[in-house]
Amino acid sequence: MSLEDSLRSLSLDYLNLLINGQAFSDVTFSVEGRLVHAHRCILAARSLFFRKFFCGGSDPSASSGLIDQTGVRVNPSGSPRSSNGVLVIPVNSVGYEVFLLLLQFLYSGQVSIVPQKHEARPNCGERGCWHTHCSSAVDLALDTLAAARYFGVEQLALLTQKQLASMVEKASIEDVMKVLLASRKQDMQQLWTTCSHLVAKSGLPPEVLAKHLPIEIVAKIEELRLKSSIARRSMMPHHHHHHHPHDLNAAADLEDQKIRRMRRALDSSDVELVKLMVMGEGLNLDEALALHYAVENCSREVAKALLELGAADVNYPAGPAGKTPLHIAAEMVSPDMVAVLLDHHADPNVRTVDNVTPLDILRTLTSDFLFKGAIPGLTHIEPNKLRLCLELVQSAALVLSREEGNANNNPPSSTTTTLPMYHHPMNDDHNSSSSSGNNHNIGNLNLDSRLVYLNLGATVGSGQMSDDHGGRHGDPAMYHHSHHDY
């Protein structure tokens, strides 16, 4: 047996004492109404905080005591005792799960800060989540970090910081901002640097950041963006290196002003002004995340008009997660936005950094409805809209797959014509014969989509999925080419 194995074995011996509960226990903590049995000698040996606490001294400043959320100090000599005479000490400063993690580390020097995979967590609505970088995992790590700092267990604090630094690389921007705030509050410079750069790269404008972060942090993020912009310009092979720094500052401010003007124009449905900015001022719609903004904040008509300018990439990935406008429309459960994006050749199979497609998002939301019903966080979603979104994206993926298969089997000739392949079923103006032809080519919904269709309890009404001229119900899997504008 190696030295490392021997040390690990000794650590597990201590951990077994904690797991076995009352065996040789001489102190009991009450956390969230649950009793945790422990051993004063081990806690005092591993933690200066507990050593001072158990010593108890007459001077409150000399003995930290256990402090609850109201700031009341608990004196061990005055604490109640259990039936067998063991001290029962109330702990209100941390939760039960975090307190157990803290004790596990004190007993063994080892701990896993990631929640159990696939278990239901309060801040994670995704079934089957591995909890590696979701909101629940980030919250647990932040709580553990706060507890480690509170109880003075610096080794655990360092371990948790490394864990968080790994998590934020794949976490949502909202969670990154939470970690950013914690790193500033607890003066963790390395974690601050990592998170601030991720927020700076997110593309979120200052007015959005200001809703989540203090104004001084927003100012630092903008300063980082400015430095990054200057660095990029200095690497460009042109002759403008002699420009004064304040000229570069002015250029960066000008870009920010352009983006703000563009968003105001989109908010007021003035796409013509956006067009003038593209043609006359060189506005880059992709870098300004114009389409992402329009999908999330504007009407379908504005998004459609923006796409028809031909200056925006419908599949442009944004932020650390690499979400496209179609990902955002899927998360919003907006059939209108999904339809207009697919009509302009949005890729239904495009993946984020985490390999998530728009179809994955809709399937996850659908399974949540089927297995959980309306749950907190999903109450704003209408089942009919969710069904339509799922059908649109599934059928678009099916058409794309078949076209790719046909292209591989039959190399295109010089006379081949490419047509738009997606069409919103609610706006179909073709006659019955056209629909029948397309139905023969595309086929029916697959079994998965039919199950979703039935389970959500939605029926296709004549006002939703019918042919306007022929008067018959349209196949929900049909996405015809339309010769008219929406």
Swiss-Prot record:
Pathway(s) it belongs to: Protein modification; protein ubiquitination
Keywords annotated in UniProt: ANK repeat, Cell membrane, Cytoplasm, Membrane, Metal-binding, Nodulation, Nucleus, Repeat, Ubl conjugation pathway, Zinc, Zinc-finger
Induction annotation: Accumulates in the floral abscission zone (AZ) upon senescence onset (i.e. at the base of pedicel following flower removal).
Biological process per Gene Ontology, one example term: nodulation
Biased composition (Low complexity): 406-418, 432-442
Annotated localization: Nucleus; Cytoplasm; Cell membrane
Biased composition regions of type Basic and acidic residues, renumbered to the chain: 466-475
Disulfide bonds: none
Stretches for region Disordered: 403-442, 464-486
UniProt ANK repeat ranges: 257-286, 287-316, 321-350, 354-388
Zinc finger boundaries on the chain: C2HC NPR-type: 121-135
Binding-site list for Zn(2+): 124, 129, 131, 134
Domain-level remarks: The BTB/POZ domain mediates the interaction with some component of ubiquitin ligase complexes.
Protein name listed in UniProt: BTB/POZ domain and ankyrin repeat-containing protein BOP
Gene responsible for this protein: BOP
